[in-house]
Amino acid sequence: MPLAAVMTGPRRPLEVRDIPSPNLEPGAALLRTLYSEVCGTDVHLHHGRLDVPFPIIPGHVSVGIVEAARGRVADIEGDAIKEGDVVTFLDVHETCNNCYYCLVARQPTRCLKRRVYGISYSANDGLLGGWAEAIWMKPGVKMVKLPPELNPKTFIGGGCGLVTALHAVDMTELKLGESVAVLGAGPVGQSCVAFASLSGAGELIAVGAPNDRLEFARRMGATATLSLEIPPQERLEAVRRLTGGRGVDAVIEASGAPEAVKQALDLVRDGGRVIVCGQYTDNGPVEIHPHWQLNRKHIEIKGCWGARYDHFHRAAALTARYGERKPWREMVSDAFTLDSANAALRAVEDRTAIKAVITPNPELVRSKLS
């Protein structure tokens, strides 16, 4: 039986367990896992901050090699997905396509029946998370074949933050030459910088910490960086100096810190746009001034939740095309086996790693990517 790192409950050490292999139904497939990311969401899961059906197998964004498929399994182009293909997949599954959010609002990330690999499936349901030697692709899971020229490590280096950032940058409706501030220098923020740069941003300011992450943001395309060690008022003054006294056209909050939302409202120019994609769990409230920061400034503010299939599809193509220009691969600073999954969580929580990944089959990674 394949092994998996199982999260049995809040703040409990993960356990490596045998998980039965599935009997593949028609339209199902089995992946042999190459990489599965360790996301900030996994830390929140471990802290018990999301309502999930423990025990679970974490790992919601993963890359694997197709080991078996039953019947015809195809991607959206109609091309068969076959043994040996390297794929990723949309972690959100079982959206109903029959509710208000799916059909009227056309916002499937809000479907109340959706299930998510690595989050809302129990380990008792089977190999439905990426921190395992194998992952069960249930019928209907939307897979994306990675182009042959794309190193899987490049894609997983972006990971969940890659598709979240693409969604957020899309929501800015960025015009060529507009100024952007990205608040947060973690995985989501780094990819926000990369995609804003590729979208033609003019002045592109990364705000965050520590300094090595800000230097990395410059490699992703930031034209200026501001450290959190600088007081908020001085950061505001610096942004205004860089933007003719106005503030930036768009701000993307990608930090998860409530205070960053308040700062975003200060940094944006009158009539600008603010996208909030970092507040995935409840980190507490923040006080704002509705008149001065919202109404009088005539700004737009939008929340950005998760990602859709189109973001995964485009992210695979974009990392294949621009992966040598944007150092997503180098974001993977630490790789861990299943036995060291607890250390992986600590590395992400302590921010000693920009991106940590689980490699359940290290020998397969070496043979595939050597």
Feature annotation, model-predicted:
Residues 236-241, 245, 282-332, 343, ...:
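C-terminal substrate-binding/catalytic core of Rossmann-like NAD(P)-dependent dehydrogenases/reductases
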Residues 20-21, 53-59, 122-127, 134, ...:
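Short Gly/Pro-enriched turn/cap motifs at secondary-structure boundaries
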Residues 22-36, 49-100, 147-148:
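Glycine-rich beta-strand-centered segment in the early N-terminal region that forms part
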Residues 133, 145-231:
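Mid-domain Rossmann-like dinucleotide-binding core that forms the NAD(H)/NADP(H) cofactor-binding site
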Residues 39, 90-144:
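Cysteine-cluster motifs in flexible loop/terminal segments that predominantly coordinate metals
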Residues 171-176, 188, 198-199, 211, ...:
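Glycine-rich cofactor phosphate-binding loops and adjacent beta1-alpha1 units
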Residues 224-230, 333-340:
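Short acidic-hydrophobic, aromatic-tinged amphipathic segments that line or gate anion-handling sites
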